[in-house]
Structures are given as structure tokens and as C-alpha cells.
């Protein structure tokens, strides 16, 4: 029994660590992509607005 117990505990710890890392990575990735997409959208809107104004004249 003691031979089986430590590996299970270790695997559980590893799984928890992996889960934490994945959630952190996904959260940071989503935050970064959201910020960049918002920035790009605002830039695109601004340039598009300028282009439409220029071409209307």
C-alpha cells in the first residue's frame, strides 16, 4: 500500500499544478488577445473613418 500511495499523491499534485498552469496560461492569453483585439479594432475603426472622410471629399 505505501508503494502505491506516494505515486498517486504525486500524480494528483502534478495534475493540480498542470491545471493551475493551464488555467493561468489560458487566462493570460485571453486577456492579452482581448486587449490587442480591442486596440486593433479601435485602430481599424479610426483608419476606416479617416479613409471614408477622405474619400467623401
Curated annotation (Swiss-Prot):
The chain crosses the membrane at residues 9-29. Its main location: virion. Residues 30-57 are intravirion. It is found in: Virion membrane; Host cell membrane. It comes from the Viruses. GO terms for biological process: symbiont-mediated suppression of host NF-kappaB cascade. GO terms for cellular component: host cell plasma membrane; membrane; virion membrane. Keywords: Host cell membrane, Host membrane, Host-virus interaction, Inhibition of host NF-kappa-B by virus, Membrane, Transmembrane, Transmembrane helix, Virion. Interacts with host TNFRSF1A, RIPK1 and IRAK1; these interactions interfere with host NF-kappa-B activation at the level of receptor complexes. Interacts with host protein UBQLN4. Plays a role in the inhibition of the host NF-kappa-B pathway. This inhibition occurs at the receptor level, by preventing the signaling of TNFR1 as well as IL-1R and TLR3. Belongs to the rubulavirus small hydrophobic protein family. This is Small hydrophobic protein. It comes from Mumps virus (strain Edingburgh 2).
